[in-house]
Amino acid sequence: MFMYPEFARKALSKLISKKLNIEKVSSKHQLVLLDYGLHGLLPKSLYLEAINSDILNVRFFPPEIINVTDIVKALQNSCRVDEYLKAVSLYHKNSLMVSGPNVVKLMIEYNLLTHSDLEWLINENVIKATYLLKINAYMINFKIDLTVDEIIDLVKDIPVGATLHLYNILNNLDLNIILRISDEYNIPPVHDILSKLTDEEMCIKLVTKYPMENVINFINQDVRYSPTFIKTIKDFVNAHLPTMYDGLNDYLHSVIVDKDLIEEYKIKSVAMFNLEYKTDVDTLTLDEQIFVEVNISYYDFRYRQFANEFRDYIMLKESRQITMQTGDKIRRFRRPMSLRSTIIKKDTDSLEDILSHIDNARKNSKVSIEDVDRIISSFRLNPCVVRRTMLSNIDIKTKIMVLKIAKDWKSCALTLSAIKGIMVTDTINTVLSKILHHHRNVFKYLTSVDNKEITVCNCSRCVSLFYRELKSIRCDLNTDDGLLARLYDLTRYALHGRINQNLIGQRCWGPLTEMLFNEDKKRKLNNLMVYIKISDMLVYGHSIEKTLIPITESLSFKLSVDTMSVSNDQYAKVVIFFNTIIEYIVATIYYRLAVLNNYVAIRHFVLKVLHTVMEACGVLFSHIKVNDKIEHELEEMVDKGIVPSYLHHLSINVISIILDDINGTR
């Protein structure tokens, strides 16, 4: 199968014959080229057609002709801003900044605004400071004034770390405000203004309320050196041993002489105060042994010889091994990470690098088309090679050579690979090509049924089903029947354009998105599935619908490390649809094995899973064969996190059947 359908290859041939000038080909071919992303920068004459085909095409036009409203729509439909969209956005930055708070929010998330831009927005009363602070408080690094009510309202909606940052930028912060916030919202008053508090009892209350937050460092100096205060803090520290509070220990070390600390705490003083103390392990009391074991990481770092002797002693006396501990300290706060980014990581051997290499080689010597084909063949699954080639800075003759090769690419449907002794037909590239051929038909179908209630839907697939109600309303997720009932309902919802991209607490980890969007293929499944026990895998029945989003709202461009690798939004969303079904399959099987610890009749259960998915999609008379070797592969999947290649192969065969059924080519 050719990667591109015949009419797309014909349109590309016409473009090549016109030396890549899209204005010189017929309007019929122009529309095809736009639909399949077979273009580079675009002329003004195609603006309306290109925008109607895909709003993100706005980035390929000269910035001076672009409508600001189209840029807004493009920003709303993207999760990363590449150099092209960034350029047109910055060109129209002033207009975008006054286009409303939602647009400003997008610009902040994409890092399109500077600190001076934000200061201007606040000073000119275009946007309220509180609105910007709720988006990302760390963006504001200049002094501002807020009322007490505004501060309290903010604290309710921003993380603790952002509140502490807010303290540092407020002109009118006072002691009463931070004490009120501490009392009502349990946010530590870690700010210099706390030093104005001279009430010793209140200081003790705050320090003991937040022992991990180093409130002690902001306490009034007179209070810090009060004998009563010192004794109270020491008693608090002693009462919580073997748990250690490093900040309080540092404080005690600063107000009590070393000799007294060593005399009272002995071997504990090594971990608590980093003091030197020598002793034999066989003289330790039971209390000291417990303390040392709990805090062994401190001894590993500060007194390694003693730590080793202690381990040997415990092994000898109790036949028990004390492992190396990391001694992780609790990190107080982290800045929120934005899902959106303007940073696009570049592969070590990106297509652009390879094109540049080919271009340079052509200038110095004759390069055969066979050599070029071999060099770029690893990119045959990328549906946007044509666009990236045309956008590159290489010579037009090199571009034409590459485009002629890409035009005639075929999916390697007959390539065989050995998976644990089983010869498995590699079908993933064929499926991706089929999706590229028929994605508009599939997308049209998904959007035509996305507003229908599945229990009463009379679409062509539902009308042939034996069971049209929700199967999982009353089910036991500890049984195979319960898992299959939920899978049936999830898949039926997906077929009606509503999916859960976050079923296991991770997004877009299936084989199609990994292959197509250049995600990290080496991620171990057991790392991906770490939250499966508390994820949406526990949801069933009517509650499923609350976890779903329309396929039209899935942020397809979030998937791509390089946004240029996505042909168009509809194509990406159809890939997400089929990829999500594969994720449902793998997650259901993994849950049964890893969470329920049920390894009985694995092959038979896999067979049931695959046929449940097909049945839910209205495919009632197809059969998938499953080899017995699936059992060994799935055991390795759970034990070692190895990607289940054969299961992926089976799942891809299933979605290929579903694709053909939706497209009417089965």
Curated annotation (Swiss-Prot):
> Which keywords appear in this protein's UniProt record, sorted alphabetically?
Early protein, Membrane, Transmembrane, Transmembrane helix
Q: What induces or represses its expression, per the UniProt entry?
A: Expressed in the early phase of the viral replicative cycle.
Q: Does the keyword Zinc apply?
A: no
Q: Where in the cell is it found?
A: Membrane
Q: List the transmembrane segments.
A: 574-596
Membrane topology, as annotated, equals:
Single-pass membrane protein
What does the sequence similarity comment in the record state about its family? Belongs to the orthopoxvirus OPG074 family.
Q: What is this protein called?
A: Protein OPG074
Which species is listed as the source? Variola virus (isolate Human/India/Ind3/1967) (VARV)
Q: What lineage does the source organism belong to?
A: Viruses, Varidnaviria, Bamfordvirae, Nucleocytoviricota, Pokkesviricetes
- Gene (name only): OPG074
